[in-house]
């Protein structure tokens, strides 16, 4: 299956879920750009509204857990904080093959929803404190969703974990 076809399956699944749950959202089709700054400008949203999705692997202390870690696009992740919260000793970004297997998306197109039973969903709360809408790529690099923050929290139900880097 091509990258586009795989991402399309995730996109359709996401849109079906949001529609079924009565979410207040809109889909924006745009040029496929990889940088958070560029895509937020195209979407007409603030960088801090962007939900950056990192597929991580937490290991150590008997823990071997894949995590979909969501944070505001204007923040940096502190992977050691994330590992500590999950109960592991270290966290690293997953390989492209693991990202593909767990999300069906290419890096940069991953929505902040886990559709895989082995992918634990956590989110840094700052993403939800500053804006009443969040924005994210929706399985494909050329499609974004802008979604009411309250609907995201209600539907996705992420575990809220402070793991952003602080000065």
UniProtKB/Swiss-Prot annotation:
One Gene Ontology CC term in the entry: cytoplasm
Keyword terms of this UniProt record: Cytoplasm, Hydrolase, RNA-binding, tRNA-binding
Species name: Escherichia coli (strain K12)
Function: An aminoacyl-tRNA editing enzyme that deacylates Ser-tRNA and/or Thr-tRNA mischarged by lysyl-tRNA synthetase (LysRS), threonyl-tRNA synthetase (ThrRS), seryl-tRNA synthetase (SerRS), alanyl-tRNA synthetase (AlaRS), valyl-tRNA synthetase (ValRS) and isoleucyl-tRNA synthetase (IleRS) in vitro. Also deacylates mischarged Hse-tRNA(Lys) and Hse-tRNA(Ser), and cognate Ser-tRNA(Ser) and Thr-tRNA(Thr) in vitro. The presence of cognate ThrRS abolishes the Thr-tRNA(Thr) deacylase activity, hence this activity is not applicable physiologically.
Superkingdom in the source lineage: Bacteria
GO biological process, one term: positive regulation of translational fidelity
One protein family per Pfam: tRNA_edit
Reactions it catalyzes: L-seryl-tRNA(Lys) + H2O = tRNA(Lys) + L-serine; L-threonyl-tRNA(Lys) + H2O = tRNA(Lys) + L-threonine; L-homoseryl-tRNA(Lys) + H2O = tRNA(Lys) + L-homoserine + H(+); L-seryl-tRNA(Ala) + H2O = tRNA(Ala) + L-serine
Intracellular or extracellular location(s): Cytoplasm
Phenotype of gene-disrupted mutants: Growth defects with elevated alanyl-tRNA synthetase (AlaRS) or stress-inducible lysyl-tRNA synthetase (LysU) levels in the presence of excess Ser, and with elevated LysU or constitutive lysyl-tRNA synthetase (LysS) levels in the presence of excess Thr. Excess homoserine with elevated LysS, LysU or seryl-tRNA synthetase (SerRS) levels also leads to growth defect. Growth defects with LysU overexpression are much more pronounced than with LysS overexpression. Reduced sensitivity to aminoglycoside antibiotics neomycin, streptomycin and kanamycin.
EC id: 3.1.1.-
Protein name as annotated: Multifunctional Ser/Thr-tRNA deacylase ProXp-y
Primary gene name: proXp-y
CDD domains: YeaK
Lineage start: Bacteria, Pseudomonadati, Pseudomonadota, Gammaproteobacteria, Enterobacterales
Record-level Gene Ontology MF annotations: aminoacyl-tRNA deacylase activity; hydrolase activity; Ser-tRNA(Ala) deacylase activity; tRNA binding
